[in-house]
């Protein structure tokens, strides 16, 4: 499986056994100015998250795209 990874401009091959791509989003103290923090990666199962954290999981190559807004 290949998934998009945080801080990478190319998709990466996931480690053996990690066949799920995910996009995790959440807010920090700067959310109103910078927008949500986004984490992209691979996992063996869809990660469990706390309240206030968004998660989207998928199981095809490079399916965890995230469109960032234009800088203000």
Curated annotation (Swiss-Prot):
Disulfide bonds join 3-21, 14-42, 27-31, 46-57, 58-63. It is found in: Secreted. Transmembrane segments: none annotated. Expressed by the venom gland. Keywords: Acetylcholine receptor inhibiting toxin, Disulfide bond, Ion channel impairing toxin, Neurotoxin, Postsynaptic neurotoxin, Secreted, Toxin. GO terms for cellular component: extracellular region. SUPFAM superfamilies: Snake toxin-like (SSF57302). The keyword Disulfide bond applies. One of its GO terms (molecular function) is acetylcholine receptor inhibitor activity. Coiled coil: none annotated. CDD domains: TFP_snake_toxin. Belongs to the three-finger toxin family. Long-chain subfamily. Type II alpha-neurotoxin sub-subfamily. Binds with high affinity to muscular (alpha-1/CHRNA1) and neuronal (alpha-7/CHRNA7) nicotinic acetylcholine receptor (nAChR) and inhibits acetylcholine from binding to the receptor, thereby impairing neuromuscular and neuronal transmission. This is Alpha-elapitoxin-Dpp2b.
